[in-house]
Amino acid sequence: RFVDNALTIQQLVEEAWEKTCGKAVQTVLHVQIADRINETRTVRCRCDCLTKAEIREREIAEYDAARLRERRRRECFRVTDPKKQELAGNMEKWTFANDDRKRPDLSDAMQRYVEQFQEHRRESRGLLLYGDVGTGKTYLAACIANAVIDQGHTARMTNFASIGNELQQTWEKQEYIDELCKYDLLIIDDLGTERKSEYMQEIVFNVIDARYRAGGPLIITTNLTTDELSKPGEIGYSRIYDRILERCLAVKGDGQSRRRQAAIKGWEKMRQQLGMEVHAH
């Protein structure tokens, strides 16, 4: 008897038997191949018991993975304000599949960002979604968060009002910020709507600066205009926005993207990767 190219089977030994059905599930073949004597190959046999066990094992693994994704999703949109619990629950369902695609160019670009997330994560490249109220910036940011969670990553979506409240409730402020920066993707929603005070400005800077230094992509949504971002009027906010614009591609909420001239160069390549047109500032 021969196997493949004149492989002479010398012995059939060491069969392993399935205890339930009594069928062989593994056979070790000692074969002679050219000048190699007694080379061992293991041939796996199939039986219904083994197949059922493997299916069950796969089902358990898929169930555990689904539970992990849902746990990460709840953590991503977690809020401490009881009035916002319902909104947080809804955000878990904000996905590209449910997108109304009123801005198809922008939706497609955001999906490409997710598809290329490994590269953008490695290069610490994020997005600054800016534009008028109601243009879907928060929705698309949540879509990105849900999509990267489905890929197996961690994400956290929050805002500086919530961060400020949570920091007031802990003595370990730096530890809190460090934990915030450990997520694979950090999303800050509604930048600029937090109350204006020296204390809050310090919080905003500390979080942005910590993420900047730690690396990893940052996504920001804001109603601020590019003029307000480039000329904030306060030195404190100027250094904050400079860090954001160094690491985040500015994308207008209506689907058109723009690049601040003073920001880091080289965004053209990323625009091409996302399939977006290049516009002059």
Task: Walk through the language-model features, giving the residues of each.
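Structural recognition of the conserved hydrophobic beta-strand(s) that form the central parallel beta-sheet
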Residues: 157, 187-189, 217-223
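Pre-Walker A adenine-sensing motif
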Residues: 109-121
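Walker A/P-loop nucleotide-binding motif
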Residues: 121-141
